[in-house]
A protein has these predicted regions:
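Conserved beta-strand hairpin/beta-sheet module of binuclear metal-dependent hydrolase folds
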Residues: 3-56, 161-173
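Residue-level marker for buried hydrophobic side chains located in beta-strands
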Residues: 36-38, 67, 90, 169-171, ...
Length: 235
């Protein structure tokens, strides 16, 4: 298997390109060499996550926490593999927890014509995963200086962005994409597209020095201004 390169974002923070820059996971390592993994890509990406872990000199036994921005299969699909490898359950916002437990998906936006078609199709297959902690808005997970949970529902009911308070990295999740520029997730893949656009405004109110996306490369130069400009124009 080809080595999965980890992209440094800040001291102790890496982006894992799982399908090029189009689908990303993240690794955090604290001063005690413990590791938190955030988002594990599609079903076949679990092995890539573990390879990226080894590429920074860590292993399965160093992982103390798995976290998901939301329940969709391009983020949670690889979680079962990584959970087995590390022996850890996944932590996810309480409004998405049951979908991960049952391997199911939330309904898509009924105002989308293609979304209406999707509602008639069976859920994409995704392995069930044990859930550890059900996260809530405003909660600060005690790891590497604090991971603040920012509930940004709409793309899914329990979608959350994560602010790494010590390193100044914002992980947007799918609240905003950075594929060929900033853009919204596709309406047909959202549970409530209008809510997606409304709750993403919260990301313009936060302080951070790097904006990292689960879809697309990071923004290192004036990220908050870039996010606020997008929100003002597209919101």
């Amino acid at each position: 298997m080809a080595k999965t390169a980890a992209v440094p974002l800040a001291p102790g923070v890496w982006r894992i390109p799982l399908i090029g820059d189009y689908v990303n996971g993240f690794m955090l390592r604290d001063e005690d060499d413990q590791v938190t993994l955030i988002d594990m890509g599609i079903g076949s990406s679990g092995a890539k996550v573990m390879a990226a872990l080894r590429s920074i000199g860590s292993g399965a036994s160093d992982v103390t926490r798995l976290m998901l921005t939301h329940c969709h299969p391009d983020h949670a699909g690889g979680a079962a593999h990584v959970s087995r490898e590390t022996g850890r359950p996944v932590d996810i916002h309480t409004d998405d927890a049951e979908y991960v437990r049952t391997g199911t998906q939330p309904d898509v936006d009924p105002t989308s014509r293609i979304g209406k078609l999707f509602r008639k199709l069976p859920d994409p297959k995704m392995e069930k995963v044990n859930v550890g902690e059900e996260l809530t808005d405003g909660q600060v997970v005690p790891f590497a200086g604090g991971i603040r949970v920012v509930h940004t529902p709409g793309h899914s009911p329990g979608h959350a962005s994560f602010l790494l308070e010590e390193s100044g990295v914002l992980i947007t999740g799918d609240a905003i994409f950075n594929v060929l520029g900033r853009r919204w997730p596709l309406k047909m893949l959202c549970s409530n597209f209008a809510m997606t656009k409304k709750t993403a405004q919260r990301l313009g109110e936060l302080e951070y020095s790097t904006a990292a996306f689960t879809h697309g490369p990071e923004i290192r130069e004036n990220p908050r201004e870039e996010i606020r400009r997008f929100l003002a124009k597209a919101g």
